[in-house]
Amino acid sequence: MISDETFAKQERLIKTKDFRKVYKDGRSYRAGFIILRLLPNAALMNRVGFSISAQSIKRAFRRNRIKRLFREAYRRNKNILRKGFDIVFVVRRDFKENFSYAEAQQVFLNLSKQAGILL
């Protein structure tokens, strides 16, 4: 049996109004330099977005790398998360440069457990 480890378009938070709603009405959980914002939705799947300001991390290639790491951590672990949430990962200014995938996955799992969405 092949597991579904894709990151489909329907799973992405893209619209500004969706991000604003999660910021306004969602709950926050923090682990170091990452904040997870969580809001229940009416869908049968999770939708995920990433927020990294250019003011906090100046170089685009660094911002993109961080997003890739957390996108991969979500993609590989989404089957062990409860469904029906809009999730936004916010990266703060004190992010360290040499961050690995293993560290991203550990932070992702810790935040998911803290938020109560880990099965």
PLM ranges: what are they?
Residues 1-119:
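Positively charged, solvent-exposed patches that mediate nucleic-acid binding
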